[in-house]
């Protein structure tokens, strides 16, 4: 290992916050609810009209924003950069954050161990496979020295920023398409005078 680099584990580089049982946090009467981020929404990359709602008054750390790293640790194990809009974090999902390391770093290391986590969950599965927090502590990572981390980050950070930005833009364009296309098809929007 290069001088100044060190071995560590996932729990040392990031915080893995488990979501809430959102059925206990429904919106109050007259309150505009937040969609609930469950495994279904994580897999499809967005919330939709069928997504459950929770109170927007939940603790801020349980609110998911575009660009947050989300790790599904039960059932369908996956890790993703959430770009599906603001929502509430449901149980069986970790919101992954760090005060010490950049997002690209803990995302890459979590994704690196995903295949092993899936195998562990499959071996233990009697009903729904999952991994325990102790598996995160066993998942080894290598931390570069500060100069190397900055050099690598200079390459990785813009790539991850662009991925997040493009996915958010894609979501917004899909919303515009889904709003305008039915109006164009029905003739509610007249485009006959447009010169091409």
Predicted regions and their residues:
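Short, charged, solvent-exposed linker or helix-capping segments at domain edges/interfaces
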Residues: 48-49, 105-107, 151
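Sequence-specific dsDNA recognition surfaces
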Residues: 11-26, 33-66, 83, 88-89
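Extended, charge-rich, solvent-exposed interface segments
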Residues: 127
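A short beta-sheet element
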Residues: 38-39, 57-116, 120-124, 132-133
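Non-catalytic DNA-recognition/assembly elements of restriction-modification systems
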Residues: 1-21, 138, 142, 146-191
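Short, contiguous acidic/charged loop-to-helix segments that flank catalytic cores in large enzymes
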Residues: 55-57, 96, 160-164
């Amino acid at each position: 290992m290069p001088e100044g680099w060190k071995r560590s584990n996932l729990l040392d580089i990031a915080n893995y916050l488990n979501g809430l049982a959102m059925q206990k946090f429904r919106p109050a009467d007259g309150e505009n609810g937040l969609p609930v981020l469950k495994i279904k929404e994580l897999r499809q990359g967005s919330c939709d009209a069928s997504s459950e709602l929770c109170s927007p008054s939940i603790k801020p750390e349980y609110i998911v924003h575009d660009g947050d790293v989300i790790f599904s640790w039960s059932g369908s194990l996956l890790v993703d950069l959430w770009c599906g809009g603001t929502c509430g974090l449901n149980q069986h999902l970790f919101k992954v954050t760090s005060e010490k390391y950049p997002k690209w770093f803990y995302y890459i290391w979590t994704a690196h161990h995903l295949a092993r986590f899936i195998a562990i969950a499959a071996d233990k599965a009697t009903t729904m496979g999952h991994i325990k927090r102790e598996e995160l502590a066993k998942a080894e990572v290598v931390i570069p020295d500060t100069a190397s981390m900055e050099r690598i980050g200079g390459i990785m950070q813009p790539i991850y920023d662009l991925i997040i930005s493009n996915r958010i833009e894609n979501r917004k364009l899909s919303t515009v398409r889904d709003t305008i296309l039915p109006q164009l098809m029905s003739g509610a929007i007249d485009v006959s005078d447009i010169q091409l």
